[in-house]
């Protein structure tokens, strides 16, 4: 009876009201983290007029010589620390950032702890860590604090709580990282939000292939396996269509890229080879470094 009533309410409730209700629930949870999130105001226009490189995990990145990025500001994303040249890229006397998306199912808390612990062993102390928090019961803030991780790194936290639904109207306040910000569908969206907030005038994307629909799971990324990515498709979509799931995911991600592109004067270019991402113009990496 209760299940039937819940379905009926969902069916007849306007989607915009559903999303606004979700945003309100998220905001109430955000208040617990408001004080640490507002510290992000320190990053406002910190790199005004500069350029940076966002490093993703798409397989095309294997074809690039990334060592010259030692002399560039980079945002290494999620599992990038497993790249063979990671230590050299993150060296040098220039700012380096390491960013992760908010944690989420289907991974267990143990898997996340193991992943962050391993990451802590590889990310050099000169790197500034940027972690995402959401309304999940187990979040990265708890994991980092309870396991004394990244104790020698400077850390910033952002809170992901604003739903970007089909008829969402962009508001600059929604991508103010010193407040509650978007719920994005991939870490590269969060990295772009940060880079724009920090004032970069040029942002270059590497390894943002978004062509997993064309590959089997073991070829999604430049590495074969991640500590936190075991049987991810099977655990996430179960018996559903992988093509349908991936297509919807790409649509949502590209819509978010488009929102940022349409509402920012920042030059964003894609250096990823063999990519489906056509929101941004392509430029060969060798021509800019």
What are the functions of these language-model segments?
Residues 2-289:
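Metal-ion/cofactor- or nucleotide/acyl-coenzyme-handling active-site neighborhoods
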